Design a protein with these regions (language model features):
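Periplasmic-binding protein-like
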Residues: 61-63, 138-145, 221-260, 278-289
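Short helices/loops that flank or line small-molecule/ion binding pockets
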Residues: 89-90, 98-99, 103-116, 131, ...
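A ligand-binding cleft/hinge motif common to bilobed small-molecule-binding domains
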Residues: 107, 120-129, 173-176, 200-236
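Extracytoplasmic small-molecule ligand-binding "clamshell" domains
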Residues: 31, 36-120, 190, 254, ...
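Acidic, polar ligand-binding/catalytic clefts
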Residues: 81, 85, 94-156, 233
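Extended ligand-binding regions for polar small-molecule ligands
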Residues: 81-90, 151, 155-169, 241-280
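Bilobed "Venus flytrap"/periplasmic-binding protein-like clamshell domains
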Residues: 58, 62-66, 74-89, 121, ...
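Ligand-binding clefts/hinges and TM-proximal coupling segments of bilobed small-molecule sensing domains
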Residues: 31-43, 94, 169-189, 228-229, ...
């Protein structure tokens, strides 16, 4: 089967200029990818631990609301930030968060510049690429379309133009046809910055976008945009924290245990409930790796 043509983000820049006001508004709310910023979190269960007694881990992520975003002070915050900060404190570590180019995450881990990466990161299908801590939450990779679109099922994506964030599971699924229910699409736009996905759909530059369902629901709520999310998911995944494949320190094992404790003692449910009205879909990880 012929693979869909893959277009990098630059190919849509001219078209996206039409939606520049929309894009600028999004960028202003999301914050900048330049430099590092530390997160200021209060009220976590492990906050009693003396900060000076904790070893520091360098943690990288890109912006992926509500899991990772910057607040009005420029601090890196979000659901994944709260979860990881709590879990690391339980095993004697504290995170130093920095925003990264998501496409460079593997080389940053391999070089030792980062200890781990996170940010709604699907471990399903990548089990042999990293050392994983998790899964700590469940998620669905889904397709979203305009409410008036004639796309109702995955089969309706045939000969359509779809946008994804580069190096994500939707990109892999659509490029390599790893889901037998997904037909041959016409073209796949791969953006290095996920903030371009939503304007591309809203402005009619693509027929559909694919991403974590949770991020799409958050965008709807925050910006008053309405999607129609297809009932059939591309993939059901477990979210994890990734360490370099050659990292032998064992932090991933300890962190996995901390995540399991947080699931068992109700901490995970409490944190997820701060961001989503119904936390139950995120806590149902039966069958996920």
């Amino acid at each position: 089967m012929k693979r869909p043509r893959r277009s990098v983000a630059i190919s849509l820049f001219a078209a996206l200029a039409v939606a520049s006001a929309f894009v600028v508004a999004i960028a202003g709310c999301s914050g900048s990818n330049d430099g590092a910023s530390t997160s200021a979190l209060e009220g976590l269960d492990a906050s009693q631990a003396k900060d000076d007694d904790l070893k520091t881990l360098d943690v990288g992520s890109d912006l992926y609301p509500p899991f990772v975003y910057t607040d009005e002070y420029g601090d890196i915050v979000g659901l994944d930030v709260e979860i990881l900060t709590e879990a690391l404190a339980r095993i004697g570590y504290k995170p130093k968060y920095q925003l990264i180019d998501w496409e460079k995450k593997k080389e940053l881990l391999a070089s030792g510049e980062l200890d781990c990466v996170m940010g709604s990161f699907s471990m399903t299908g990548r089990e042999d690429e990293y050392r994983w801590a998790g899964p700590y939450l469940a998620s669905r990779q889904v397709v979203a379309v305009d409410p008036q679109s004639d796309i109702y099922t995955l089969a309706d994506l045939e000969d359509k133009v779809v946008a994804v964030q580069s190096t994500t599971k939707p990109e892999d699924i659509l490029l390599n046809h790893t889901n037998e229910n997904v037909p041959q699409i016409k073209e796949l736009y791969c953006f290095s910055d996920r903030s371009y996905l939503n304007p591309a759909l809203v402005e009619g530059l693509v027929d559909a976008i694919a991403a974590h369902e949770s991020s799409l629901l958050t965008y709807e709520k925050d910006y008053g945009v309405t999607y129609r999310i297809l009932d059939e998911p591309l993939l059901e995944v477990g979210l994890g924290t990734a360490f370099d494949i050659n990292d032998t320190r064992g932090i991933d094992v300890k962190l996995t245990r901390a995540y399991q404790e947080m699931l068992a003692d109700g901490t995970m449910e409490r944190l997820v409930s701060k961001y989503f009205d119904d936390p139950s879909p995120f806590l149902n990880m039966e069958g996920l790796s």
